[in-house]
């Protein structure tokens, strides 16, 4: 199933971009937002911190949607979401995230996220988030 495999790659990419060995910036992009927009930006920053701390369990349990977590777990050859994310974190280079914009529609949101690697490669992407159990969680990024 290509979609399910893409989900594993997505979470791996999230963990990777979340800085496998720690990001290069101390930028607090959530500081420029307020309310729900700040919560969304904080979720992105929390992903970066969890990856820096090599905490795949936190990424899977707290920062991605239940659907994405289940999809990754299903595709991880029985090892679970946390193991798949931990493995991805170990195999990647650091990247920093900066949330540039947030648009909210009900319990769905789109965040414009800029990522920058140690090699100064910059990409700007649209991430989607869903509000689940009172917290904004990442549901997808461009694969």
Task: Mark where each language-model region is.
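Sec-dependent bacterial lipoprotein signal peptides
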Residues: 1-18
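Bacterial lipoprotein signal-peptidase II cleavage site
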Residues: 15-30
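Sequence contexts marking disulfide-bonded cysteines in secreted/extracellular proteins
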Residues: 20, 59-63, 80-84
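Short, aromatic-enriched amphipathic alpha-helices that serve as compact interaction elements
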Residues: 34-54
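Hydrophobic pocket/interface hotspot
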Residues: 47, 59, 129
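Short, well-ordered alpha-helical segments enriched in acidic and aromatic residues
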Residues: 53-71
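Surface-exposed, charged secondary-structure patches
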Residues: 78-124, 143
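Short beta-strand edge/turn micro-motifs at domain boundaries
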Residues: 122-143
